[in-house]
Amino acid sequence: QRRCPRIYMECKHDSDCLADCVCLEHGICG
């Protein structure tokens, strides 16, 4: 199970996101 804090973060790449979050199509970490 991925550990992804539920924090609103804009992103361009997965590396912009925290922990195991990835950058989704709409430019938000999730």
UniProtKB/Swiss-Prot annotation:
What role is this protein assigned? Strong inhibitors of trypsin.
Cellular localization per UniProt: Secreted
Q: What is its main location?
A: secreted
Q: Which residues are annotated as modified residue Pyrrolidone carboxylic acid in the UniProt record? A: Q1
Tell me the Gene3D superfamilies matching this sequence. 4.10.75.20
| Family, as annotated | Belongs to the protease inhibitor I7 (squash-type serine protease inhibitor) family.
Q: What is this protein called?
A: Trypsin inhibitor 1
PTM (free text)? LLTI-III seems to differ from LLDTI-I by the absence of cyclization of Gln-1.
- Read off the domain note: The presence of a 'disulfide through disulfide knot' structurally defines this protein as a knottin.
Disulphide connectivity of cysteines: C4-C21, C11-C23, C17-C29
- Which GO molecular function annotation, any one, does this entry have? serine-type endopeptidase inhibitor activity
Site residues by UniProt (Reactive bond)? R6, I7
Which GO CC terms are listed, alphabetically?
Answer: extracellular region
Keywords noted in UniProt? Disulfide bond, Knottin, Protease inhibitor, Pyrrolidone carboxylic acid, Secreted, Serine protease inhibitor
Superkingdom as given in the UniProt entry: Eukaryota
Q: Which InterPro entries match?
A: Prot_inh_squash (IPR000737), Proteinase_amylase_inhib_sf (IPR011052)
